[in-house]
Structure formats: C-alpha cells, structure tokens
Amino acid sequence: MSNGIVIIGSGFAARQLVKNIRKQDATIPLTLIAADSMDEYNKPDLSHVISQGQRADDLTRQTAGEFAEQFNLHLFPHTWVTDIDAEARVVKSQNNQWQYDKLVLATGASAFVPSVPGRELMLTLNSQQEYRACETQLRDARRVLIVGGGLIGSELAMDFCRAGKMVTLIDNAASILASLMPPEVSSRLQHRLTEMGVHLLLKSQLQGLEKTDSGILATLDRQRSIEVDAVIAATGLRPETALARRAGLTINRGVCVDSYLQTSNADIYALGDCAEINGQVLPFLQPIQLSAMVLAKNLLGNNTPLKLPAMLVKIKTPELPLHLAGETQRQDLRWQINTESQGMVARGVDDADQLRAFVVSEDRMKEAFGLLKTLPV
C-alpha cells in the first residue's frame, strides 16, 4: 500500500499544493503535519488588521476540519516535527511517526528579530498565531515603533497610522524600501508616510529595549531614546531550514531545490518561503502558486521544470499603493521617472536602454501589465 505524500506545513504553499494535487488525483494519500491550528487565513491581511479593527479569529477563512473534509486529507495540527529519517523515509514527532513515498517541506519562514538587549519585548506579525498572541497589546497601544522600513514595515506603518496611532519607523538605510528600489523611486511613498504623520528615523539604529512603568523605552544611536507602547520587528524573514539541515539536505539561505523543486534528496521537495529555487528565495504569492502547480505534477510522476515569468510584487499601502517588477534592486540601472498627480511610472533601464525593472503607483498601476510584457524573463 502507498504511503503517499507527507507535507510539513499548512500555509499558503501547502494549501496550493494540496489543491493542485487533488485536481489530478483524488485518492493518493495526503498527510499534512503542522505546528499551528491549520485553519486557513490570508497572510497578507495581517498588514491591515489594525486599521480594519480585525481580531485574529476574524481572519479564519476555513477551519482545518473543513479543509480535511474537502480535500480528503489526514491532518495533524499542533504537531512539531522533530526529525526526518531520509534513509528510512520516516517523519517523526515526539509521539508519532509517518512513512512517506514523497515528502514536501513547506515550513515557511520566521520573522527575524534583531539581536539587541530587550529583544524579547519585540512583537512579530508573521502569522495569525503571532497576531493572536499580541492583538490586545497592539489594539491598546497608542505609540508604536516599527523596526524595519522594508515592504512589511512600510505597510504596517501606514496601517497603524490609519488606525490613529503615533507611529515611528526606524531603519539603518537612508530611505524606505532600500533593498527593493533606489531612494528616488521610493521617495513618493516616503513623503506620503511623513505627510500622514509617520515619524521616520532613517540612518538610525535601535540599540536596546527596556520595560518601564509607562511603556517601553527604546534606546537609539546618537544618544537618543523614545518611549512607546509596542515594538514590532519587520526586519525580514528567515527561511525555516532546521529540519532540512538535520535531514542532511543542502541548505544555503533556504532549502536548496532545483527547477523541479527537488532537494538534494530525490524523495524530498521544498516549496514556498522555506525554498531556495536555483539560488533565489521568492517569498511572494505568485511564484508560490506557480511552483505548487509544477510540484503537484512532479509528485504525481511528471517531470516538469518550473519556468517563472516576470512577476509583479504589490506593496499594499492603500494611501499610495505600488506595483514593481524586474530587477528593481540593481545598482547599475538608470531610472526614468514620470510623476503626475495621479501616480508615478519609474522605468529602470540598462546601458543598452533595455527595460530591466519598473515601479508604478496609484492610478498608473494599470500600466503595469503592459510594462510586464516588455520585461525580459
């Protein structure tokens, strides 16, 4: 009898994979094991929960039981996988073990928390579970410090500001979204955040946190400090690789996989935020959807390589939303920026005047799909 496919994880990547497998095979045994409740929620909604007044439970779209029934699954929620015996093809938890024919790691990524004194006072918003643990503190907080001015930090800063809170955002870089685009392109959003009342502390460093009678004292460089009620770490994600490492798989930033989503072990695959596909970590929805479609075919006996097109990344800052695509972080591009009252189109071209990247905002986001077609893959 077939042991079927075991999937470790229950987030967006795991669910997309299940749906794609079940479109092609209704009966192959599918087992999912995850440390959380396995209820479905839309992770991008976490960037807007405060202004929307949503509680953690409001985010649930489908319970684990409903998911299991709909797709004929064996689910093991609230279960920590402790080990993978790759030779025997066995996954182990403290009280259980599962044989597999094929194993998929969809373990996601965890929020990186800077190593400063008092780091345990920092909150993270990387899952429904994490939000549930701190929703009362965040709802009651009047003064909020967001550490990190990247995509998530910028989204959260705007959301907390829209909810009427006093928001300070701190980052080492000289501009927001510094790892995604140059300052001349991000300046429109940066200006909008400042207009809304977000206090930007750029080229600044958090040095420590300390609980006080009236809140949390954040010590900064240059002998500065501010007092706040909550501190959120938005300094990026780290792929969860510990299990894969213990199983003897090849690890770099993430779990290394090839174009077939196969790890260094022929029977183990990786998908989603934990995977590093041919040297790239792509923690965005579209590449995960496309990867899940390809992996479902390969798990069922096909041999289909993943071919990713040029893809849009959306920055969900409602007062000034942005779409970007291509190699926006490249240092050698020349940016042609067209700004109007209704939005911006910024084109990044190389020495041969070939479009390599673009960023569009507000009403001009409708131009994104035309630009996307002209980007080299």
Swiss-Prot record:
It comes from the Bacteria. It holds the Pfam family Rbx_binding. It is found in: Cytoplasm. GO terms for molecular function: oxidoreductase activity, acting on iron-sulfur proteins as donors, NAD or NADP as acceptor. Its main location: cytoplasm. It catalyses: 2 reduced [nitric oxide reductase rubredoxin domain] + NAD(+) + H(+) = 2 oxidized [nitric oxide reductase rubredoxin domain] + NADH. Signal peptide: none annotated. Keywords: Cytoplasm, FAD, Flavoprotein, NAD, Oxidoreductase. Pathway: Nitrogen metabolism; nitric oxide reduction. The keyword Cytoplasm applies. GO terms for cellular component: cytoplasm. InterPro entries: FAD-bd_OxRdtase, FAD/NAD-bd_sf, FAD/NAD-binding_dom, NO_rdtase_NorW, Rbx-bd. Its EC number is 1.18.1.-. Its cofactor is FAD. NCBIfam families: PRK04965.1. One of at least two accessory proteins for anaerobic nitric oxide (NO) reductase. Reduces the rubredoxin moiety of NO reductase. Belongs to the FAD-dependent oxidoreductase family. This is Nitric oxide reductase FlRd-NAD(+) reductase.
